[in-house]
């Protein structure tokens, strides 16, 4: 690992990407809730909220997490997750890059193709880094959670320029469209806030990487 990548800033960046990835990867369960509401997590949320662009969405996430004080509340949030990200309908916001980047128009009633070009590209990126999608996560490699987890990895092990190019070519070119879809169809507050925070974070990180790469 180079001196450029092995520093506290990149470790912190990697942690944030990994957190965002984990929340898109699966429903919030009791274990995750405990981790997200621990004393250490509260300090993390407070620090993240110091950035004006993040504060509103962080405040919503913290408030919504505080409401998850029963099995029923967790089940309701899990239902929101399922309806948004696991069911491919007009009222969902499928978290796959290929659905937002495909050049082929999808006819009404047709199912967009998964495991397509973006999936193949991400699979190749993972192989190059000697990584793979975990077997218990049976999703295409262009799932947002996989892409965010990969950025968490390269934040630790590659140059700022390489990170900049990957984020620009594989994340920011579709993330805003996905977030707009979440905002349109989500009836709750948690996943809208999560999506908007993710977009704000990625855009902020891209600006930082750009300034670091040109300085």
Curated annotation (Swiss-Prot):
UniProt keyword Transmembrane helix present: no
GO biological process assignments: protein complex oligomerization; protein folding
Keyword Methyltransferase appears in the UniProt entry: no
Assigned GO CC terms: cytoplasm
Keywords: Chaperone, Cytoplasm
InterPro entries reported in the protein's UniProt record: Chaperone_TorD, DMSO/NO3_reduct_chaperone, HscB_C_sf, TorD-like_sf, TorD/DmsD_chaperones
Purpose of the protein: Involved in the biogenesis of TorA. Acts on TorA before the insertion of the molybdenum cofactor and, as a result, probably favors a conformation of the apoenzyme that is competent for acquiring the cofactor.
Family of this protein: Belongs to the TorD/DmsD family. TorD subfamily.
Name of the protein this chain belongs to: Chaperone protein TorD
Organism: Shewanella piezotolerans (strain WP3 / JCM 13877)
Designated gene of the protein: torD
